[in-house]
Amino acid sequence: MEYNTSELCDIYLDQVDVIEPMFNSYGGRSSFGGQITTVKCFEDNALLRTVLQQPGVGRVLLVDGGGSLRRALIDADIALLATENEWEGLIVYGSVRNVDDLDELEIGIQAIASIPVGADQQGVGDVDIAVNFGGVTFLPEDHIYADNTGVILSPEPLDIE
């Protein structure tokens, strides 16, 4: 499904939070949305693999990577796993790598930067907790919508018809 965050803000501005502009688009899908699952991890992506093995229809993985620009939390293998399990998208307060490969996958990916260095694999982090970045607190099961213009958050699904 296509989402237009500008139009959604025109209709629902009093009901949504707008995340501070900081993200770049890396996936093959330019807009996406769904109910969020949160992960908080720093320079370690083993937990992401575990979460992304779950069915992802209608879901977006929101990753609080502490804004790290030193190690990529998302690489081509993790993004492919998300695509295979039908996740709608990934929003990463952190970095990605293998950007040419990410562009070929049918998934939306928003992150703050790219870097060629991969993440650790220790499995350190938390799932389904409240996280805060970009001027917004994200709660598990909130709904998020993203496109090339921006990212918005709503406690309820937005009617886009």
Curated annotation (Swiss-Prot):
It comes from the Bacteria. InterPro entries: RraA (IPR010203), RraA/RraA-like (IPR005493), RraA/RraA-like_sf (IPR036704), RraA_gpbac (IPR014339). One of its GO terms (biological process) is regulation of RNA metabolic process. GO terms for molecular function: endoribonuclease inhibitor activity; enzyme binding. Keywords: Cytoplasm. Its main location: cytoplasm. The keyword Zinc does not apply. Gene3D superfamilies: Ribonuclease E inhibitor RraA/RraA-like (3.50.30.40). Coiled coil: none annotated. GO terms for cellular component: cytoplasm. Pfam families: RraA-like. The keyword Transport does not apply. SUPFAM superfamilies: RraA-like (SSF89562). It is found in: Cytoplasm. Homotrimer. Binds to both RNA-binding sites in the C-terminal region of Rne and to RhlB. Globally modulates RNA abundance by binding to RNase E (Rne) and regulating its endonucleolytic activity. Can modulate Rne action in a substrate-dependent manner by altering the composition of the degradosome. Modulates RNA-binding and helicase activities of the degradosome. Belongs to the RraA family. This is Regulator of ribonuclease activity A.
